[in-house]
């Protein structure tokens, strides 16, 4: 929980009432946490689990074989782990990320398309920009984040990515989120 973020959004609301132009509505920012907001669009995401329960993570791993585990409050690729079909070190990773059940984490089926990059789509008032920034993992990394050493490459947006970004972007624009970035791996958000 980031109390400073909450305070900042309340201060931005006050600034807005006093006449300042605020691009993204502060309440909308509070109500759409980055990683959880995607759960509203299951048709655009790969298999995903949000839980505190270690046993639920183990069942998800057994079902999907190769998974990604990440903290809900992480950024820049920090705290992201890949676990292969053998489950090597899964217990330790779960303990590290969820502090023995105290912290909720996200688990997703591994998408091998990450090798081609995690595409960042810029959406302005519901409309995606014509180009994306593909953040491509380097070396033995699975993280494409620039902060984790990924290489950024501009690419034209695909028709599929445009349709996905437009569907999500228009819904979020109606809620006051006018400037957003959407991450897409392969065809999945």
Predicted regions and their residues:
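Short glycine-enriched loops at secondary-structure junctions
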Residues: 26-30, 135-137, 185-188
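Hydrophobic beta-strand scaffold residues
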Residues: 22, 67-68
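Conserved N-proximal alpha/beta basic substrate-recognition cap immediately N-terminal to
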Residues: 1-52, 56
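Phosphate-binding site of ATP-dependent enzymes
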Residues: 54-55, 62-66, 73-168, 172
């Amino acid at each position: 929980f980031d109390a400073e973020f909450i305070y900042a959004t309340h201060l931005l609301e006050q600034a807005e009432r006093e006449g300042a132009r605020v691009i993204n509505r502060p309440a909308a920012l509070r109500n759409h946490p980055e990683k959880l907001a995607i759960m509203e669009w299951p048709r655009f995401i790969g298999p995903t689990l949000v839980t505190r329960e270690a046993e639920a993570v183990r069942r998800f791993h057994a079902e999907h074989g190769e998974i990604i585990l990440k903290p809900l409050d992480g950024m820049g690729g920090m705290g992201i782990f890949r676990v292969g079909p053998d489950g090597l070190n899964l217990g330790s990773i779960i303990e590290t990320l969820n502090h023995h059940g105290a912290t909720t984490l996200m688990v997703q089926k591994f998408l091998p398309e990450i090798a081609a990059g995690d595409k960042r789509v810029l959406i302005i008032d519901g409309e995606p920009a014509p180009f994306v920034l593909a953040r491509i993992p380097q070396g033995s990394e699975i993280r494409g984040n620039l902060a984790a050493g990924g290489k950024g490459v501009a690419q034209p947006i695909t028709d599929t990515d445009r349709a996905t970004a437009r569907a999500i972007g228009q819904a979020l624009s109606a809620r006051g989120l006018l400037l957003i970035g959407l991450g897409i791996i392969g065809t999945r958000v």
